[in-house]
A protein has these predicted regions:
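Catalytic cores of nucleic-acid endonucleases
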Residues: 84, 141-142, 167-247
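Catalytic centers of nucleases
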Residues: 62-66, 72-190
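Generic surface-pattern signal
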Residues: 54, 99, 193-194
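Generic structural signal of hydrophobic/aromatic residues within well-ordered alpha-helices
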Residues: 40-41, 188, 261
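Non-catalytic C-terminal interaction segments of nucleic acid-processing enzymes
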Residues: 1-19, 27, 231-298
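Nuclease-adjacent, charged terminal/linker segments that flank catalytic cores
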Residues: 1-66, 298
């Protein structure tokens, strides 16, 4: 007969207990459980995202190589920094996962189901604020523009790169990436309605765990019901705001990654620890493969 074994909060938070539990693979532990100690949660997030932040940090230019190894430098606000990191994350995901890139390309170029994908594989996702773009496609490097992600291919007629266009229009297909937890109407909905942003991927859930794209859609529903917008504006806007799951990306993974970025940005993750792990895991050995930053041994 099994017996319940009680454990106090103090015992659960003890160094020994954290060490014991931390020896298990991090994906075996639900770090979202309210009973998980903060220190253990930080360790789990660190284990899951340490390589990801190095890759994205190098790409955005916020992680720099010095005589003392890799260190984090940024004069930007946290929200701006997180935005650049998620821009790098999405570009990486789109270029490494054809299904996600195809969905994003179809959405951004406003193509209907059943369109020919014959030329699609010629295009790659490009982040307008990323270092690889500055190095390889300087003319498309615009870190302050209203487009975080575009799609480029080599022109079949000229030896130049050209952007994907919205179907039957001479307008570049553009995606804005938002990594915010509030002010969704002012910073997303209103700007899509006004035309400042063509399309937005809003990455995060709010502080209550509600996906921000759902909140944006609810805002549009309310605006329609109260006659703040017409049915035409509603129909034209709602499909232009999507979240990660629209592209088969995991919302929980992204929210957890955001938490890890936050604790690292605010100094809860030691730069020395990252430097040591970079040496141990040969994170210094990154290279560009099809303009995606990957480990050399990948």
């Amino acid at each position: 007969v099994s017996k319940n074994i009680s454990i106090t909060s103090e015992e659960l938070n003890s160094t020994d207990m954290i060490s014991i539990v931390s020896s298990f693979p991090s994906n075996f532990i639900n770090h979202r459980s309210p009973g998980i100690p903060n220190e253990l949660r930080r360790k789990i997030l660190h284990q899951q995202y340490k390589n990801r932040i190095v890759s994205d940090g190098l790409e955005t230019g916020h992680l720099q190589l010095t005589d003392n190894g890799y260190i984090f430098k940024s004069k930007q606000s946290f929200s701006s920094f997180a935005g650049f990191v998620f821009e790098a994350y999405l570009v990486d995901e789109f270029n490494s996962k054809r299904t996600a890139r195809l969905r994003a390309f179809q959405w951004a170029t406003e193509r209907s189901e059943g369109w020919s994908t014959k030329t699609f594989d010629e295009y790659k996702a490009v982040g307008t604020g990323l270092l690889s773009t500055k190095t390889n496609y300087l003319g498309y490097y615009e870190p302050q523009s209203n487009a975080d992600i575009i799609f480029l291919r080599k022109s079949p007629l000229l030896d130049i790169m050209e952007p994907a266009l919205i179907y039957n229009q001479q307008v570049s297909a553009k995606i804005q990436v938002k990594s915010i937890k509030n002010r969704f109407k002012e910073d997303i909905v209103d700007k899509v309605i006004s035309g400042k942003y063509l399309r937005v991927i809003t990455m995060l859930s709010d502080n209550f765990g509600r996906p921000s794209w759902v909140i944006c859609h609810n805002i549009l529903h309310h605006m329609l019901r109260t006659n703040a917008i017409t049915s035409d504006v509603y129909a034209n806007t709602i499909g232009r705001i999507q979240g990660p799951e629209y592209f088969d990306l995991n919302q929980y993974y992204i929210d957890d990654y955001y938490d890890y970025i936050y604790q690292w940005y605010n100094g809860n993750e030691s730069s020395t620890k990252h430097t040591d792990e970079a040496a141990e895991q040969e994170i210094t050995g990154y290279k560009y493969v099809n303009n995606v930053l990957v480990p050399i041994d990948a």
